[in-house]
A protein has these predicted regions:
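Conserved AMP-binding A3 loop
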Residues: 54-82, 89
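Structural core segment of the AMP-binding/adenylate-forming
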Residues: 1-37, 136
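Gly/Ser/Thr-rich phosphate-binding loop
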Residues: 155-188
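Conserved pre-ATP/AMP-binding loop-to-beta segment of ANL
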Residues: 41-58, 92-93
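Hydrophobic alpha-helical segments in the ANL/AMP-binding
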Residues: 2-16, 84-85, 104-117
């Protein structure tokens, strides 16, 4: 990765805290190799979801029982996405954060919701602190309790977490401590 010197002939290595610019052959891209791979996974899932096949094989994470592989009709996924968008009153064109693994249905449903609601989807590699590299809070996000808990520990992440208008928390139980910390948050 190469830091940028703004055409001054010098390279500055400490003036940019964002994602690095990386060269791969004749191509330059922004972000880490892991982030680039996650973006590829998201694009591949979008392509798979939009193909002519009526159903999709999905994997549950096991948060509510044993992990399972299921065949799901795409139209059922669309109806579920429509119901969620309607219930949470998420306007078309809003920003959404994808920070859940795409190998599980929860991450895949964020992509489906973005397609159904014409949402601007920002994909961030799943991690314990998915807000760490963001500058602005998305309108809508789905996170695990652990991601929310860890985000509360960083002042930057906590500030963004408070600004997310619609936050789904799933994939595990919410501890009484986490519930208490979130009680005064303005999120829906």
């Amino acid at each position: 990765s190469f830091p940028q010197g703004l055409g001054t002939g010098s390279l500055f290595v400490t003036n940019f805290s964002g994602a690095p610019l990386c060269l791969e052959g004749e191509h330059m891209w922004c972000g880490t190799p892991d982030q680039r791979e996650f973006n590829r996974e998201a694009a591949h899932f979008r392509h798979t979801f939009l193909n002519a096949e009526p159903s999709l094989s999905v994997q549950t994470s096991g948060s509510t029982g044993q992990p399972q592989r299921l065949s799901v009709e795409k139209q059922r996924m669309v109806r579920s996405a429509e119901a969620t968008l309607r219930f949470l009153r998420i306007p078309n064109g809003s920003t959404a954060l994808l920070c859940l693994p795409l190998k599980f249905i929860a991450g895949q449903m964020m992509v489906v919701r973005s397609l159904v609601g014409s949402l601007s989807l920002r994909a961030v590699c799943p991690s314990s602190r998915p807000l760490a590299t963001l500058h602005d809070a998305p309108f809508f996000a789905a996170m695990t309790p652990m991601q929310v808990f860890e985000s509360l520990r960083s002042p930057h992440d906590r500030r963004l977490l408070r600004r997310i208008r619609r936050l789904l928390i799933g994939g595990g139980s919410i501890s009484p401590t986490l519930e208490e910390e979130l009680r005064d948050f303005p999120n829906e």
